[in-house]
Amino acid sequence: MEENNIVLSRTQRMKDFVKSWALPVICFVVFWLIFKFVLMTSIIPTQSMYPTLSAPCFTVGVRTDVLNKPYERGDIVLFQRDDGNERFYAKRIVGMPGDVLEIKHGQTYINGVEYEESYLNETPEDLDFGPFQVPEDHYFMMGDNRNNSYDSRYWDEHFVPANKVMSKVYLHFHLGLSDKD
């Protein structure tokens, strides 16, 4: 009888061990799969999207291949450029495929109509650009901090191919660090 108790005791200990590790391991695998295939995170180190995203800012986006709807003008997205650099950029989609885009004295016009941008906190510098037509399967990107954003206005290739847009940003958190930290 004592032998059976020892065997049961070992069996019970093994079950308890498996139970105690199963939930954490399953949770880890599920979270890893979600962040590998569904969500995309990034830290935005610059003020190019200020005041919407204040650097340093942690962003969470849904990956393009999971997102089952097209991007819209005004969406903040994470993308890569065809510049040989592996880093991700966070900008706002301003120009959609087929749009004729022009900037006159800092004001953006899309298809000849003044584009209202309530998220800007200051008047953009007196810049003239275009008119250009956004090619099919491409986007024109600009940062919300127009006077401090390296974006489509300044790149040699002004337009971002749709296949380089990796995710749409849904959540963002200011990390609370200053430049002096």
Q: Where on the chain are the PLM-derived regions?
A:
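Active-site loop architecture of trypsin-fold serine endopeptidases
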Residues: 147-157
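Protein maturation boundaries and topogenic segments
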Residues: 1-88, 159-181
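Short strand-turn-strand beta-turns centered on an Asx-Gly dipeptide
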Residues: 110-112
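Phosphate/adenylate-binding glycine loop and adjacent helical scaffold
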Residues: 143
